[in-house]
Amino acid sequence: MKIAFDAKRITHNATGLGNYSRFVVNSLSTSFPEHIYQLYTPGKGKEALRKRIEERPSVSFHYPEGRFDKLFPSLWRTSGLTTTLRKEHVDLFHGLSNEIPMNLKQNGIPAVVTIHDLIFLRYPQLYKPIDRSIYTYKFKQACLRSDKIIAISRQTMRDIRDFFHIPESKIEVVYQGCDPIFGQAVQEDVKSSVREKYQINGPYILYVGSIEERKNLLLLVKALKALKEDISVIAIGKHTPYRIR
């Protein structure tokens, strides 16, 4: 089977959607090496990120080729790519980050899209109206045009159902994977050294992610106050003005 992916996040995003996209491709190519994996991205992006894709004969990167497509890579990603996929006789397209090209169904190309969240609809006050409109259109169209939707959580599944009126039968909840590094044992002396360095005493919850309002870290802090047990929160991520709250 020849499987094509929207690989923009693979080459452009170091965290979040990029990590998810790279994990999916690496895991599939490792577990199912008999298939062909073609990664389509509007630009080469960052070399360091491309190198995080494990080198295998079955995995290859593809970029815009025609002059027009090179001049307008965003347009190529949303529409021109379909022509390329048809010529390549792709068996399946997977939009890894909330979007798929137009006219896939009309060209006989089955499609799957991963929807990560609809936070711009659940917390609209955190987004500009123009951004909400663009996201809503893109995400909803991807859900309507795809043959199957992957939701990374049950909450995302419910949001897709409620906001876009998509039947649950079209949605599969597939939780995100975990990098192999988290399966490596850590020596006790290393743990002690980290605790001492950051003055950590007792049990704690580790939060990894940007410290901003839409992540709702404040709710976690408030919830811990209601517990009798003394548990700390260790937050690792980019600081924003939200931090002072």
Located regions from the model:
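Carbohydrate transferase catalytic cores enriched for Leloir-type hexosyltransferases
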Residues: 1-245
